[in-house]
A protein has these predicted regions:
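Hydrophobic/aromatic-rich alpha-helical bundle segments in the mid-to-C-terminal region
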Residues: 122-126, 130, 141-197
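Amphipathic alpha-helical segments used for helix-helix packing
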Residues: 86, 98-123, 168-172
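Residues in soluble alpha-helical coiled-coils and helical-bundle/repeat scaffolds
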Residues: 53-57, 61, 82, 99, ...
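Hydrophobic alpha-helical connector segments
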Residues: 61, 75-102, 142, 155-156, ...
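Short, basic, alpha-helical segments at the C-terminal edge of helix-turn-helix-like DNA-binding modules
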Residues: 64-70
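N-terminal intrinsically disordered/low-complexity leader segments
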Residues: 1-11, 196-197
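Helix-turn-helix
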Residues: 2, 15, 19-57, 61
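Short alpha-helical scaffolding segments that buttress acidic/His motifs in well-ordered protein cores
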Residues: 94, 108-112, 159-163
Length: 197
């Protein structure tokens, strides 16, 4: 009985997040209120507030959903590309992350812009950055890359700038056409880090 209740609760939270995602993408994060999400989902106010106290909490869970989704793609990629050179694999993983085209990346670009005006979002960004870089560092280590590839922040800033440019400046087509240069930049950076390690 308790497990069934938890499953239903998780389903409700997912439904609320999907409604919130729709609102965020249509209105922007800063302009979306709890009332907007409640209206979008058609659930009672108490039902929504039972699961989420704020749109920031919803955004956090959406970002965690995005990380989970990205991790599943990485696991699948690694299972099918074992024969590739370690640098090529890491380059593919990072380039794929930077140039992904989906609603969660659009949402992440909104999040990156909004965090400059919201302390809670900045804190969330730092938490997500730490979590993501630790996971990607572990993957790099498993591939045999000895350097700490996120130590100076360059790759994080480079990837985030590509994401924001893709969404805000409509640079995605250009980046897709020139993807090999983006990948080569990341690979060369990692190789140079290893040489200087």
């Amino acid at each position: 009985m308790k497990e069934e209740k938890q499953k239903v609760g998780q389903m409700r939270k997912r439904e609320i997040r999907e409604a919130a995602k729709k609102c965020f993408l249509n209105k922007g994060f800063q302009n979306t209120t709890m009332e907007d999400v409640i209206t979008e989902i058609g659930m009672s106010r108490g039902g929504v507030y039972h699961h989420y106290a704020s749109t920031t909490e919803m955004l956090k869970d959406l970002m965690l959903d995005g990380n989970e989704y990205r991790n599943s793609l990485i696991t699948e990629y690694l299972a099918h590309n074992r024969s590739k050179d370690k640098y090529q694999q890491m380059g593919d993983i990072l380039t794929s992350k930077a140039l992904a085209k989906n609603d969660l990346m659009k949402l992440y670009a909104l999040f990156l812009q909004a965090k400059n005006y919201n302390r809670d979002l900045e804190d969330l960004y730092q938490e997500l950055k730490l979590h993501t870089t630790k996971e990607l560092d572990l993957i790099a280590k498993k591939l045999g890359i000895t350097a700490h590839i996120f130590k100076d922040g360059f790759l994080v800033h480079y990837i985030n700038s590509l994401i924001v440019s893709s969404e805000v400046l409509n640079a995605r087509n250009s980046f897709d056409v020139h993807k090999k240069y983006i990948k080569e930049t990341m690979i060369q950076y990692i190789i140079d880090l290893e040489k200087n390690n």
